[in-house]
């Protein structure tokens, strides 16, 4: 049988990578790395009005159970090694969402000697959510953009990028 006749009969034709991407994007377990005032907006998004749980986004207390880290707030030079350690403890595939001007590029404290000018200097970031602080709706939109990115992302190409990463430790 050809694929158009199967689709007419109610069958869905997809690849295994597409199926896994769809399942994974619908069940993001996130670790909140709240460093400043943006973390308050992150709490608003998880509360009853917006209810992130209905999208399948479940908070985790340990990085070993999480596949998404939401970095919210000002990242200082002293906190950067701890954030990298937490990121390294997350299982593959892992994603990072940078929330707010301070996490994106240093924000108000950009010229301070103690601030990292963007968390993307420490960990690879998949989605940036702008604002100071960004609203809960902006965070939800950013998470939906990450879901769409996971659905269309080719897992094989992502693995190849990880293998070519300069920070990659040899096995």
UniProtKB/Swiss-Prot annotation:
Swiss-Prot/TrEMBL GO biological process terms: aerobic respiration; electron transport coupled proton transport
Sample GO molecular function, one term: 4 iron, 4 sulfur cluster binding
List of residues binding [4Fe-4S] cluster: 37-38, 102, 132
Protein name as annotated: NADH-quinone oxidoreductase subunit B 2
Manner of cofactor binding, per the entry note: Binds 1 [4Fe-4S] cluster.
Subcellular location: Cell inner membrane
Gene for this chain: nuoB2
KW 4Fe-4S (keyword) present: yes
